Amino acid sequence: MFSILNKLGIIWLALANISNCDNSKSGHKSIPKYNVKYYHANIPKDFANRFVELNDKIVENGSFEILGIDGQPSKNQYLCFTPNPNTAVNVSIESAQRNTRSKEIENEPKSEAEIIQRGVEMIEKSFSRKDCVFAYGSNGGYWTLGYCYGDKVVQFHENLQHFVATGKHKPEYPDYIYVLGRFKGSSKKPTNLDNQSPWASNNLDLSEFTIHESSIISDATAKNEQSRFLQHTLYDGEICDLTRKPRSIDIIYKCDPNHRGRIEILDQQEIKTCVYQMVIGVPKLCSLDEFRPNKVEDQIIDIDCKLIDQTNKVKADKLSYQDFFYYTDDIPSDNKIFPIPHSYKVSLNNYNLSPCGHGFYLGQSKLPINSPSVYFNFRHILVFNDQYHSSSDLLEKLGKMLKVCVGNKILSPHIENKRQSLLSWNDTFILWFELYDFYGSFISLVKVSRDGSKEELELKLRLINPETMLDQDGDLVKVPEFDAPNNAWNFQKFSKGKGSALDSTNNDKNNKATAENDKQYQSTSTDIVTVTVTESLETTSSEDGTEEVSNEMVILKKLADKLGMTDINELHQAIEDLDIELEVQHDEL
C-alpha cells in the first residue's frame, strides 16, 4: 500500500478534504475515511524496521510504513499501521438519529412552504424587539457586529476600554455606525446601537424567506451532515462608497448543534463589495427535525502512528504484527521538567477546535484523558493554522488573537451563578498553553501574563522550549507550579478583578523554601516581550478640557475604511514612506 498515507498527503486533519459526498443517497457503499491517531510510544528503531518487514505476510491485515510526518525524514519518524479497508472493522458513525428523523419525515411529508413557516415561527419566538445581539472581534477584531431584530444590522469600531470597564458596547466613532441592511418598515431615525424597531409585533413576511441545504463536515470526525437553513435578505443599508449602491446582507438562520442555549452570531463575511452574509445560530430551530443536521453513516478506519526512538539500540527478536498495538504513550510524566516534551504530537481529531481568529484555535479534548500528569489530563491547547517567519512574527500574531479573545472567548476559572465567567482585562493571571500546528506537531509553550491593576491593556508573552525552559531570547523561565483554580490547569495564577495575582507568591508562606531557587531566575531573565493591544488615536484637548480625535486621524480613519485596511498605523506608515504630507482642511470633514 504505497500508501493511503501518502495519498492523504500526510495532512491528517484534512478529513474534510476526503470525500464529503453522501454516497448512501446514490446507493453506493460509503467510501472509507481515515482517522489518524498519534502515540508518543518510543518504538525502538530496529523494532520499527522489523515490523515493516512483516508487510508481505500480513496483506490481509494491513501494512506498516515508516514516515517523517512533517515532511522531514531526518526529524521525528513514526511507524504507522494502515488496516486493509476490505477486512478492517467497520467503526461507523451512529446513525440512529438519522434513521429516526428520516422515518418521521417520511410519515409526515411537509411542503417547502410548511417548513419555512415552522422555521420562521421559531425565529419570531427567539428574538426581542428591545435588544440587539452583538459579536465583538469580526475581521480580526476590527469590527463589532450588531443584529437588531425588526430594525437593522450594523457594524462599528468598538470603544474597547469602555467595553472592558462596563461590558456595554459603545462605538469609538458614533458618526461611523455602518448599516449593512434594514428590516422592512424599520426606523429612519439617526442610527444608534439600540433596537429602534417600530414594529408592533414580531411577525415576519414568509415570502421574504428561502430554504437551502448544505453539506458540511462536522469537526474533524468525518461526520457528513446535511443541514437546512433559512435565508432572509435585508436591503436598504448605507450607500457603499465603491459601488454607490445601498449595502445589503443575507441573514442565514440555522440550528447550531453546539449552541450554548443562546442566540449567537456565528460568522459574517463580505461575499462581494458591500454585499454581506451573516450566520446566526438559533437554538429553537434545533427543536425542529427539519433543521437539525442529518448525520450520515460512514466507515471510519483508524491509522495508528507511533513515534520511533532513534536512540534506543535494543534489537528485536521474534515479532508479530499484534505486538505493535502493545506500544502506547509513555508520556506525559511529571518527572520531566515540563510534562510535555518538545517532540510531542497530538491527534487533532481528538479535540474540539473553537476558532479564535488570526489562524488560531482553542482545543479541548473530546474524551477524558487518564495519564500520570493531572496537568495533561485537564489542560486546553492552542492550534495555529498559518505560517510565521520568526518568533517575533509568531508573538505578534498571538497578541492580535489574544486581543480579540480576552473578554470574548477564553473562559476564566471563576464560577459565577454556576457558570464560568469570561476572562477579563480586569483579571490578573498567568496562563500557559501548548501551541501546535495543524499537523498536530508541537511548536512552543506560550506563557501569557496580565496585571489587571494596570489601565493599559497589555499582555506579556513568552515562547518557551519545554525541555530547556528557555524563552525566545534564551532566558531561563521558572518551571511553573500551577494553582489551577477549579481544575483550570492552564492557569498558573488567577485573581478576579484588579488584584495582583502575579505577586501573590510573595505572601504564600509555603513558598519560603523556594525563595533561594527563585533568585537564579532573577539574574537570567531579562526582557519579556510585551504586546500592547490598545490602538489609541492621537487626541487633542478642547477648550472645555475634553479630548477630541485629531483631524488628521479622522482623515486616516476614512482612508483606511475605503481601502479596506484594518490598521490605521499601517496606513500612516505607508504615507510617511511615500513622503506624502497630510494636509487637513476643515471643509474636508
Swiss-Prot record:
Residues holding a mannooligosaccharide derivative: W143, Q155, D241, R247, E270, Y276
GO BP terms in the entry: endoplasmic reticulum unfolded protein response; retrograde protein transport, ER to cytosol
Compartmental location: Endoplasmic reticulum membrane
Residues carrying covalently attached carbohydrate according to the record: N17, N61, N90, N426
One cellular component (GO) term of this entry: endoplasmic reticulum lumen
Assigned keywords, A-Z: Disulfide bond, Endoplasmic reticulum, Glycoprotein, Lectin, Membrane, Signal
Regions crossing the membrane: none
Name of the molecule in the record: Protein OS-9 homolog
